Regions:
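Left-handed beta-helix
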Residues: 1-152
Length: 152
């Protein structure tokens, strides 16, 4: 803090959840922490007095079809789930095909996962298509990343 004396700083006390994110791996780990750490989730999103302002999209609610299963996941509206989702974050408009398993993954908006796929520790950017019978696997310390608008 060699320039601390030259500036004017404002601070405030924060007693809630905090995560230092300085890398892609940190982002992945701390984001998924919201699916398993109830204290972190409620500290950030569970306080009624702390409103979250966002754009309204008037999207359909999530559709859970026969054979679907969801555990410890955050799922945005307009998603269609036919497979199994565990400890994952699905953004708006994600589609999970029949028989597919998505674990410990973050799928950004518009991602489509085909039938009988297996995804573990995967991060997809927007509008990614994952073909039927595809297996993608990363690790907690090095998640598998699929860039925007790619087809795998």
């Amino acid at each position: 803090m060699k320039n601390a004396s030259k500036g004017c700083y404002r601070t405030f006390k924060h007693n809630g959840y905090f995560a230092h994110i300085s890398s892609f791996t940190d982002y992945f780990r701390h984001s998924l922490d919201l699916t398993t750490n109830r204290g972190a989730f409620y500290s950030l999103l569970g306080i009624p007095e702390r409103r979250i302002f966002t754009r309204v999209h008037n999207s359909a609610p999530v559709v859970y079809l026969n054979g679907s299963s969801v555990d410890n996941s955050l799922i945005a509206d307009d998603c269609v789930i036919e497979g199994k989702v565990e400890n994952s974050i699905l953004f708006r408009g994600v589609k999970i095909g029949r028989g597919s398993v998505v674990k410990n993954s973050i799928l950004f908006g518009g991602t489509t996962v085909g039938r009988d796929c297996d995804l573990n520790c995967v991060v997809t950017d927007k509008s990614v298509t994952i073909s039927d019978f595809c297996r993608l696997s990363g690790h907690e310390s090095l998640p598998f990343y699929v860039s925007k608008m790619r087809r795998v």
